[in-house]
A protein has these predicted regions:
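Short, flexible beta-strand-to-coil junctions
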Residues: 44, 55, 77-81, 94, ...
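Non-catalytic C-terminal interaction segments of nucleic acid-processing enzymes
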Residues: 66-71, 86-129
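Acidic-basic catalytic patches of nuclease active cores, encompassing PD-(D/E)XK
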Residues: 1-45
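Active-site-adjacent loop/helix micro-motif of nuclease/hydrolase catalytic cores
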Residues: 47-68, 81-87
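Structural motif
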Residues: 28-34, 49-56, 75-80
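Hydrophobic beta-strand residues in large extracellular and virion-surface proteins
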Residues: 39-41, 72-75, 101
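Intrinsically disordered, low-complexity regions
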Residues: 14, 49-51, 60-63, 96, ...
Length: 129
């Protein structure tokens, strides 16, 4: 089941980033598996690495792969367990300036996804939120 979820989210992510790029046309290359990441996208102005984790089991191993030298996205299913895993490690995630987390609701009739940038969210919001 995990492999099907991973394959689904990988395909969803490729479609999502291609659709976002329809107007700007900045994508130069999309590659699977570069440097141990699920997806790599070379834009004209940056590189972005994607980690696809349908169910976040070990968030610390994900955090160890991230740095401030490139753009990173964590793509996961929108579930209470995944949300709680992110909250548990929030204090670590806010230190990565170019990290975003995409929570995907593939079968929702309305909101298909929501995205949070921990670094930015921490800078502009109240600690209690």
């Amino acid at each position: 089941m995990e492999n099907k979820s991973h394959a689904f989210l990988l395909e969803w992510t490729v479609n999502f980033i291609k659709n976002k790029d329809i107007i700007s046309r900045k994508i130069e290359k999309i590659k699977n598996g570069k440097d141990g990441f699920d997806l790599y996208v070379k834009y004209k102005d940056r590189e972005q690495y994607f980690i696809i984790a349908p169910n976040i089991i070990d968030i610390d191993s994900i955090i160890k792969r991230i740095n401030n030298n490139a753009y990173f996205s964590l793509v996961t299913l929108n579930s209470k367990e995944n949300f709680d895993a992110v909250l548990k490690s929030w204090s670590k995630m806010i230190s990565f300036k170019f990290l975003n987390i995409i929570f995907v609701n593939p079968f929702s009739g309305l909101d298909k996804k929501w995205i949070v940038f921990p670094y930015t969210h921490h800078k502009i919001s109240d600690e209690s939120s």
